Amino acid sequence: MKLGIINGWDEASFKYVAELGLHAVEFCCNFYVDSMEVAGHTDEIKALSEKYDVAVGSIGRWGETRVDENGEAIPAALQHDKNLIDAASALGCPVYNVGCNWTEGKTYKENCEIAIRYFGQLIEYAKGKNVKIAVYNCDWGNFVHGEKA
């Protein structure tokens, strides 16, 4: 196990993590950041990871509205998740953190079924990429948390 912290994907961030004596970093590429900010720069990020001996331990995207009012995947949101799964794979990052928003007008059971479908698409997409899908334990754009979940 490597200890790390949440930080950015620029050189100053990798240098800072290394100066702390840590060997892992987690990227939070949240809903207000284009996923290509990470996914479009994996060669540069990988070089920084190697230069500073700081592995990318996980990548996550918090706060995204992933399903619409009918419980269907929003194509742009799904594409951001796929971009970041691809980035994780390219960087040797083993975990992608994700949530699923609540759909108003649906029951808890229906919302669970919607989330399972959404997560299932990501799990299927990540097959063969050496990336596991994890659900973050926070309510920011996610109802799958707490005791009931």
Describe the role of every protein-language-model region.
Residues 1-94, 127:
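N-terminal pre-domain/capping segments
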Residues 50-51, 67-149:
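Active-site acidic/histidine proton-transfer and metal-coordination neighborhood
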